[in-house]
Amino acid sequence: MKLYCLSGHPTLPCNILKFKSSTIMLDCGLDMTSTLSFLPLPLVHSTRLSKLPGWVTKDGNNQFEKELKECSGRVFVDSVPEFCLPETELIDLSTVDVILISNYHCMMALPYITERTGFTGTVYATEPTVQIGRLLMEELVNFIERVPKAQSATVWKHKDVQRLLPAPLKDAVEVFTWKKCYSMQEVNAALSKIQLVGYSQKIELFGVVQVTPLSSGYALGSSNWVIQSHYEKVSYVSGSSLLTTHPQPMDQTSLKNSDVLILTGLTQIPTANPDGMVGEFCSNLAMTIRSGGNVLVPCYPSGVIYDLLECLYQYIDSAGLSNVPFYFISPVANSSLEFSQIFAEWLCHNKQNKVYLPEPPFPHAELIQSNKLKHYPNIHGDFSNDFKQPCVVFTGHPTLRFGDVVHFMELWGKSSLNTVIFTEPDFSYLDALAPYQPLAMKCVYCPIDTRLNFIQVTKLLKEVQPLHVVCPEQYTQPPATQSHRSDLMIDCQPPPMSYHRAEVLTLPFKRRYEKIEIMPELAQSLVPFEMKPGVSLATVSAVLHSKDNKHVLQPPPKPVAPPGSKKRKRPAEESPETPPFKPLLSGSIPVEQFVQTLEKNGFSDVKIEDTAKGHIVHLQEAETLIQFEEDSTHIICEHDERLRVRLRDLVLKFLQKF
């Protein structure tokens, strides 16, 4: 069993498991941190960005100034943003049989995999994962395509050039594998390959293994996966949460008794309490509004935004914010808000009950009805007419490199009355803000990450007790900035196996058994022999027939009698007779009783010697040794076949035949 690691990002995994002649891809996350190396894509012409000076090397070389721009001491690529793909050279991706998706954040690289590698298999995911994943991809494509960039920078990627660049460009990994965004045509083609599944639904793969999605408690439709055969079980835990938010709670019971547990997608902010962060978010928002400023919340169009809107629904009246408009701007804003209300069966129990009252599961429906929350596809048209300040704007993208958020950063960045509040934990807020410096607006970092922390993981592993744990190397050591915090790493016994990008792990687990069916007519011919109370054995002479990964024992073919002929056949043409089977032996030989038997049969001067594997009986007079081991017996005597046979018969008296 082998695990191929194709991604270096622990919360955006992409691994391939080779298990019983099947090749299974576990997620295909897209690392978007690469876009932080690029300049933002403004919706309207930005004089500030267009006047940034080109980067010049220390020796005055200005050949890169068209591709690289400098802003407040940082160097950025002036080109269409590119994304860091999973490894494509480590294994032939056209050999992948199936792709299992755990949540909508972990499927953003799907079009690259399914449309550009020769992949012909099937993708499995839950319906909310597919629908919300579609929205995220659609939004991403829209953000990139609506601001076309004339030039495409490539010179800076050459190794001899990259090493001259300042950090972080100098340290960027696998820059030649970075790719521009896919098209909507590729998105639709990729999604057409997905087969929808429900929680606890068992899916057979080629008769080899069975895969089952389980609720992971993190997002709408998010799943952990159990991959098992008749005698082996692998659990894949990715992006899970034990907190009570809007999704169904995590199914932990089904993860028990795993031979291998692959663990990814833990919280990226292990020291931050999500409830505390939500409280901070609300108080900073209220403080800014009261002082006459605007609040900008860079966010994804699904996920944490539902919980933030629910908290604000309960908070705005008590905080005196009932007259403040809330704007949600995204090309998919309307679809996202509607989807959240119709996926009732994927919600936690309390929200499911509201559907039958009937009430909307999420309170943002009431915010929309009361005109406190308004949603728009973009900043043009209706939004321009309705726009009032001070206000709160939820919009994307959290990288601050593309989307409507770029416009608001340029619009509000010059005033210290305004505040940008970062709630998404996927990106460094300092790196996100770098191309907007110097910045007058206030910045607040309230990362809300409900995924498992290390304390919860340690408790979970003690409860489900897998034989082996496999995880990214980042989880086996404390963070570099907090090297003294040994509690910020996975603690389990035996210690977890770790992996990094482009590594192949041989998992410490060997297949020991295989299920085989036996034909009824063959079963009838068996004669069991009782070895001890409750245990019987029988010898089987059969033909093993394997097809479609099913194994069947069939009776051996009977020799075909040759057709009658007067012509005498040569001996070579006659059907060979099957030699009789030698009986199988079982049991153990009590050495002291065996020595007594030897003495009764005329052998004297017998000595016994203990060894690491058993005993040696030495017949000194006959110059013969008899070695007794757990699974074998050897009689060593030179040039006396009659003596050997005589001793063999004495040994056989102590063993059972069947």
Swiss-Prot record:
One of its GO terms (biological process) is snRNA 3'-end processing. Coiled coil: none annotated. GO terms for cellular component: cytoplasm; INTAC complex; integrator complex; nucleus. Residues 547-586 are annotated as: Disordered. A motif (Nuclear localization signal) lies at residues 566-570. Component of the Integrator complex, composed of core subunits INTS1, INTS2, INTS3, INTS4, INTS5, INTS6, INTS7, INTS8, INTS9/RC74, INTS10, INTS11/CPSF3L, INTS12, INTS13, INTS14 and INTS15. The core complex associates with protein phosphatase 2A subunits PPP2CA and PPP2R1A, to form the Integrator-PP2A (INTAC) complex. INTS9 is part of the RNA endonuclease subcomplex, composed of INTS4, INTS9, INTS11 and inositol hexakisphosphate (InsP6). Although strongly related to RNA-specific endonuclease proteins, it lacks the HXHXDH motif that binds zinc and participates in the catalytic center. Its function as endonuclease is therefore unsure. Belongs to the metallo-beta-lactamase superfamily. RNA-metabolizing metallo-beta-lactamase-like family. INTS9 subfamily. This is Integrator complex subunit 9. It comes from Xenopus laevis.
